[in-house]
């Protein structure tokens, strides 16, 4: 992955968006998540939280503690340096799922549309590790990457 162009965009008076290009890629998102961890470890006074998205990181800060320019100056070295292995390592979660027809009403539709049996769809869903790009919009709603490289499911 080539180094993306980084832009610092004001998001109101208390947030800064660190935007990495225009494409959505798993490797890029992993870098963004790692940057959020690096910022937390740096404990920059005035920074209250970071929120990763597909291709950017929102940094919330207190402008009474540090200015936008001061924040960019503190972030730039973190953006420019490769993430620590600990920061880049993804968290792993095992999530229980239920494919009961009452709780998964679209299972039959997905099976029919993909030409797979319901059992094959379930197996396909469970045989992959899902990468969560971000949580958001609906609280706690995971946004996961493309699951399949074929037209199945």
Give a label for each model feature.
Residues 1-81:
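Generic N-terminal segment detector
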Residues 14-16, 55, 93-95, 128-130, ...:
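Structural beta-strand/beta-sheet cores of well-ordered domains, especially the beta-sheet scaffolds
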Residues 46, 82, 128-132:
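Short secondary-structure junctions and interdomain/linker hinges
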Residues 52-53, 91, 105:
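Short glycine-enriched loop/turn motifs at secondary-structure junctions
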Residues 83-89:
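Conserved short beta-strand edge segments in small beta-sheet-based binding/regulatory domains
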Residues 89-99:
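Internal glycine-rich flexible loops
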Residues 97-147:
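Anionic-ligand-binding alpha/beta catalytic cores of soluble enzymes and soluble regulatory domains
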Residues 148-153:
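Conserved small/polar residues in nucleotide/adenosyl-binding loops
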């Amino acid at each position: 992955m080539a180094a993306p162009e980084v832009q610092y965009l004001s998001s109101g008076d208390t947030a800064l968006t660190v935007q990495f290009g225009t494409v959505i890629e798993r490797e890029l998102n992993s870098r963004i998540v790692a940057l959020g961890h690096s910022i937390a470890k740096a404990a920059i006074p005035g920074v209250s939280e970071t929120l990763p998205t597909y291709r950017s990181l929102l940094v919330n800060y207190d402008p009474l503690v540090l200015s936008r320019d001061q924040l960019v100056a503190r972030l730039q070295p973190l953006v420019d340096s490769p993430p620590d292995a600990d920061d880049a390592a993804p968290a792993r979660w095992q999530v229980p799922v239920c494919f009961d027809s009452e709780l998964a009403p679209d299972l039959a539709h997905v099976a029919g549309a993909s030409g797979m049996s319901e059992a094959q769809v379930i197996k396909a869903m469970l045989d992959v590790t899902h990468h969560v790009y971000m949580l958001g919009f609906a609280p706690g709603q995971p946004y996961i990457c493309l699951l399949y490289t074929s037209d199945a499911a």
